[in-house]
Amino acid sequence: ILQSISKFVLAAGNLFSGTFKYTSAGLGGTGAVNFGQKYFFETRPTALQVKYRAKVEPVDLNILKGPLEKDTQDKARIFVAIVDWTTQHTVSSTYVLFGSNNGCVGAWDPETTKNPGEGQIIGYGSLWLTETTSASDWQNAKIQIQWYDQTTKPADGNYSLVISCAANAYGDYMNGCSKNYLHIDDT
């Protein structure tokens, strides 16, 4: 269960392949997500299949100047990326009460970025969710992978797989609805 929460800032419910580190700093801190997992592919995948349930409501927080205005429809998101990265890609969100260095660094989108700096994105699949589903019925999704490169495969030992499921698509900007949730099963 991925659930958004808000005390002073928005903590987007997020499930992803990679690591997370939080560093406290007075009345706030920095959360750093390191995207990417080493994974060996025998064959090239064509899609990511998941079951999901979601509650997606209008935006009530926009702490770090994200793209969604308050009272507009929030978005949840599930995406997969097949990558050829030498290191994980880091996204850092910093918020300290009365701080002057608040912001988001490293945000990326596989739909619009072919290389965020660590190596190329070979292909991606993305599902944007803007509506609440039934709380009791699981929705089936088959997220097709779109290929930027039809032949390259990740180098042995490189980071090759990114999966991200977020109750708030722009949670790295602390931008979204604090009441959203996204339940994921059968990935």
Which stretches of residues belong to each language-model region?
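Short, solvent-exposed loop/turn and secondary-structure capping segments
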Residues: L61-L64, S92-S93
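Extracellular carbohydrate recognition and processing domains
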Residues: T87-D156
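Solvent-exposed strand-to-loop "edge" motifs in beta-rich extracellular domains
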Residues: L2, K38-E57, L64-K70, V83-W85
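Extracellular carbohydrate recognition
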Residues: A135-D137, K153-D156, N168-T187
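Extracellular beta-strand-rich recognition modules
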Residues: L48-Y52, V56, I145, G157-D172, ...
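Surface-exposed, low-complexity/disordered Ser/Thr/Gly/Pro/Asn-rich loops and linkers
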Residues: I1-R44
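Mobile, glycine-rich extracellular loop/lid and propeptide segments
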Residues: R77-V80
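Short consensus segments that form the blades of beta-propeller domains
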Residues: P67-T72, G176-S178
